[in-house]
C-alpha cells in the first residue's frame, strides 16, 4: 500500500480555493481516501479554523468532495441529453444512474451512499467520482482524553483508526485497516535465502495471486500443492507434511 500526502484542502476547494483544483485532481488518481483528522489540542500547532473540531473537519472535507462530484455529474447529465432524447439506450441507462447519484449528492451525502446494483455500479465507475471512493478516517489523537475519543468515534461517518503521529502509535492498525478497505491481503513465499510478502486482492485464485510474482504464473499455471498452515507447523517441514499425506494437489 502506498500512501500519498495530498495537502491544500480548505473550505471552498471545490470552487478552486487554496490548492482546490490541484488537490481534487490528485484525489481522482487514488484508490481510496485516508482523512487524517486532528483530535488533540496544542496551542503551538495552529488549526486552519482556529479550533479543534474533528467532526466538523470531516464534514468540510466530505462536503468539498460532494460539491466537486455534483458539478461533474450535473455536467455529464447535461451532455447526455441530446443522446437521451434520440433514444440512445446506453445514454438512457447512464442518465438514469447519474440522476440517482445526483439526488444523493444534492442531499449532501457521499456518492458511495447511493444504492446501486452491480450493473449501475459498473456504469458509474468510469466517472471516477471522488466521494464514491472508500474512505478511512485516521484520528490523530495524541494524549487525548478517552471521553473525547469516545464522543468523536460515536459520530464518525465510517471506518476509523486511532493514531498518534508524535509517538508513532497505531500505524500497524492503519495499514491493516487500509488493506481491509481496499480488499487486499498478503501471502508469503519462502526459500533458503529469504521470505517475501506479496499483496493481492482478497479471494484471488492461485494463478492470479501468482502474477504478483510474475505474469507467467497466470498463463502457465498447472496446479498447486496445498497444505493447511497448522498441519505444516505441526509436521515441522514441508517434506514431512508430504510424507504424512497432508499435502494435496488442486
Map each language-model feature to its residues.
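Amphipathic alpha-helical coiled-coil segments
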Residues: 30, 61, 66-69, 73, ...
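Switch II of P-loop NTPase G domains
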Residues: 1-35, 39-55, 59, 115-127
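Buried, small/hydrophobic-residue-enriched core segments of structured protein domains
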Residues: 49-65, 101, 110
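C-terminal-of-GTPase-core extension/linker across diverse P-loop GTPases
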Residues: 79-250
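ATP/adenylate-binding site constellation spanning eukaryotic-like Ser/Thr protein kinases
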Residues: 3-6, 70, 132, 203
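Conserved nucleotide-binding/hydrolysis micro-motifs of P-loop NTPases
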Residues: 8-10, 38-44, 51-53, 66-67, ...
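Residue-level signature of catalytic and energy-coupling elements of molecular machines
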Residues: 5, 23, 34, 73, ...
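Short, compositionally biased low-complexity segments
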Residues: 37-44, 67-79, 154-159
Amino acid at each position: 500500500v502506498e500512501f500519498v500526502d495530498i495537502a491544500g484542502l480548505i473550505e471552498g476547494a471545490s470552487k478552486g480555493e487554496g490548492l482546490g483544483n490541484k488537490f481534487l485532481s490528485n484525489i481522482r488518481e487514488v484508490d481510496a481516501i485516508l482523512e487524517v483528522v486532528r483530535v488533540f489540542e496544542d496551542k503551538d500547532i495552529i488549526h486552519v479554523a482556529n479550533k479543534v473540531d474533528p467532526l466538523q473537519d470531516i464534514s468540510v472535507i466530505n462536503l468539498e468532495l460532494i460539491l466537486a462530484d455534483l458539478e461533474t455529474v450535473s455536467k455529464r447529465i447535461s451532455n447526455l441529453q441530446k443522446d437521451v432524447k434520440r433514444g440512445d439506450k446506453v445514454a438512457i441507462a447512464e442518465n438514469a444512474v447519474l440522476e440517482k447519484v445526483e439526488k444523493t449528492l444534492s442531499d449532501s451525502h457521499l456518492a458511495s451512499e447511493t444504492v446501486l446494483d452491480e450493473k449501475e455500479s459498473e456504469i458509474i465507475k468510469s466517472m471516477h467520482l471522488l466521494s464514491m471512493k472508500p474512505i478511512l478516517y485516521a484520528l490523530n489523537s495524541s494524549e487525548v482524553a478517552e471521553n473525547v475519543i469516545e464522543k468523536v468515534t460515536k459520530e464518525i461517518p465510517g471506518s476509523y483508526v486511532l493514531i498518534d503521529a508524535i509517538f508513532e502509535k497505531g500505524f500497524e492498525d492503519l495499514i491493516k485497516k487500509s488493506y481491509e478497505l481496499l480488499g487486499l491481503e498478503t501471502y508469503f513465499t519462502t526459500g533458503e535465502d529469504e521470505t517475501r510478502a506479496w499483496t493481492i486482492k482478497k479471494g484471488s485464485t492461485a494463478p492470479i495471486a501468482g502474477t504478483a510474482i510474475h505474469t507467467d504464473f497466470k498463463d502457465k499455471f498447472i496446479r498447486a500443492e496445498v497444505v493447511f498452515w497448522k498441519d505444516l507447523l505441526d509436521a515441522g517441514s514441508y517434506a514431512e507434511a508430504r510424507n504424512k499425506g497432508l499435502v494435496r494437489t488442486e
